[in-house]
């Protein structure tokens, strides 16, 4: 998708770019597939900040996306490609043969009028979803499940793609976008193709206000705070940390491991930093 670069008519416009959205074919979302989305400004149910630098932003409705692809054997026609403010990828509106409508992530190359389907025995074609055991080696996939029936959890961002590299017993080895190679159960579903909107990574935000519209607040350096607010704060003028770097809560930062390994780490064949 082409990118529109603005002329530097103001300091904020300088170096700003936007997508042209030529792939979008429908502006208003399907009313039956949206629901209200309450803002939480990064707070949990106790009001404690769990995600920093969030708050404000434009009002959004949540689009209900079918990550499970569990309508097996029923063909669906792509009715529209739409914008989704809640994710970097575009979404495709499907009209199933039985009358149901659903949204899926729009893969690269999927067009209005295409026919997609899911389930065992579906053709190896962009937009179709199959169990990993039926997908040939070397095939590019996205929206990958980690547990059968749970719905896709991996490889969902714009331009993301994983590749099937091996099949051993009941597990399939996938090369993920990070370079990590990971075992996933062969009964897990995955969708053929690469997630669309490849040029998302080439867009330049250009100004702080545009980031505020997205719901992101400023990230303040610890050294600019007071010692009450951050271990790096205080001092006259610019001062060195005088200690190994710390998080705002006093934990070691910048390279120090502070978490236990997950039990699921045993499914990692090669870590991303070994690639």
UniProtKB/Swiss-Prot annotation:
<dbReference type="Pfam" id="PF03947">
    <property type="entry name" value="Ribosomal_L2_C"/>
</dbReference>
<feature type="region of interest" description="Disordered">
    <location>
        <begin position="221"/>
        <end position="275"/>
    </location>
</feature>
<dbReference type="InterPro" id="IPR012340">
    <property type="entry name" value="NA-bd_OB-fold"/>
</dbReference>
<dbReference type="InterPro" id="IPR002171">
    <property type="entry name" value="Ribosomal_uL2"/>
</dbReference>
<protein>
    <recommendedName>
        <fullName>Large ribosomal subunit protein uL2</fullName>
    </recommendedName>
</protein>
<dbReference type="InterPro" id="IPR005880">
    <property type="entry name" value="Ribosomal_uL2_bac/org-type"/>
</dbReference>
<keyword id="KW-0699">rRNA-binding</keyword>
<dbReference type="GO" id="GO:0015934">
    <property type="term" value="C:large ribosomal subunit"/>
</dbReference>
<comment type="similarity">
    <text>Belongs to the universal ribosomal protein uL2 family.</text>
</comment>
<dbReference type="InterPro" id="IPR008991">
    <property type="entry name" value="Translation_prot_SH3-like_sf"/>
</dbReference>
<feature type="compositionally biased region" description="Basic and acidic residues">
    <location>
        <begin position="227"/>
        <end position="239"/>
    </location>
</feature>
<comment type="function">
    <text>One of the primary rRNA binding proteins. Required for association of the 30S and 50S subunits to form the 70S ribosome, for tRNA binding and peptide bond formation. It has been suggested to have peptidyltransferase activity; this is somewhat controversial. Makes several contacts with the 16S rRNA in the 70S ribosome.</text>
</comment>
<keyword id="KW-0689">Ribosomal protein</keyword>
<dbReference type="GO" id="GO:0019843">
    <property type="term" value="F:rRNA binding"/>
</dbReference>
<comment type="subunit">
    <text>Part of the 50S ribosomal subunit. Forms a bridge to the 30S subunit in the 70S ribosome.</text>
</comment>
<dbReference type="InterPro" id="IPR014722">
    <property type="entry name" value="Rib_uL2_dom2"/>
</dbReference>
<dbReference type="Pfam" id="PF00181">
    <property type="entry name" value="Ribosomal_L2"/>
</dbReference>
<keyword id="KW-0687">Ribonucleoprotein</keyword>
<feature type="compositionally biased region" description="Basic residues">
    <location>
        <begin position="254"/>
        <end position="263"/>
    </location>
</feature>
<feature type="compositionally biased region" description="Basic and acidic residues">
    <location>
        <begin position="264"/>
        <end position="275"/>
    </location>
</feature>
<dbReference type="InterPro" id="IPR022666">
    <property type="entry name" value="Ribosomal_uL2_RNA-bd_dom"/>
</dbReference>
<dbReference type="InterPro" id="IPR022669">
    <property type="entry name" value="Ribosomal_uL2_C"/>
</dbReference>
<dbReference type="GO" id="GO:0003735">
    <property type="term" value="F:structural constituent of ribosome"/>
</dbReference>
<dbReference type="GO" id="GO:0002181">
    <property type="term" value="P:cytoplasmic translation"/>
</dbReference>
<dbReference type="InterPro" id="IPR014726">
    <property type="entry name" value="Ribosomal_uL2_dom3"/>
</dbReference>
<dbReference type="GO" id="GO:0016740">
    <property type="term" value="F:transferase activity"/>
</dbReference>
<keyword id="KW-0694">RNA-binding</keyword>
């Amino acid at each position: 998708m082409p990118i529109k670069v603005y002329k530097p008519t103001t300091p904020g416009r300088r170096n700003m770019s936007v997508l042209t959205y030529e792939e979008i074919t429908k502006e208003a979302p399907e009313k039956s597939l949206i629901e209200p989305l309450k803002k939480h400004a990064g707070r949990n149910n106790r009001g404690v900040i769990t995600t920093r630098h969030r708050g404000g932003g434009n009002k959004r409705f949540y689009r209900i996306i079918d990550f499970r692809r569990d309508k097996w054997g029923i063909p669906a026609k792509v009715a529209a490609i739409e914008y989704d403010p809640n994710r970097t990828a575009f979404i495709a509106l499907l009209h199933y043969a039985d009358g149901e409508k659903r949204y899926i992530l729009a893969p690269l190359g999927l067009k209005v009028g295409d026919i997609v389907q899911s389930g065992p025995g579906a053709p190896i074609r962009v937009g179709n979803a199959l169990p990993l055991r039926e997908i040939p080696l070397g095939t590019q996939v996205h929206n990958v499940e980690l547990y059968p029936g749970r719905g896709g959890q991996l490889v969902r961002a714009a331009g993301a793609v994983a590749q099937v590299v091996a099949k051993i017993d009941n597990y399939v080895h996938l090369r993920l976008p990070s370079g990590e190679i990971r075992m996933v159960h062969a009964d897990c579903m995955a969708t053929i193709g690469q997630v669309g909107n490849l040029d998302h990574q080439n867009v330049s935000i250009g100004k702080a206000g545009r980031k505020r519209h997205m719901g992101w607040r400023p990230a303040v350096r610890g050294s600019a705070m007071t010692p009450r607010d951050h271990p790096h704060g205080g001092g006259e003028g610019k001062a060195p940390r005088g200690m190994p770097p710390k998080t705002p809560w006093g934990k070691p930062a910048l390279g120090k491991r502070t978490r236990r390994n997950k039990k699921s780490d045993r499914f990692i064949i090669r870590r991303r930093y070994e690639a």
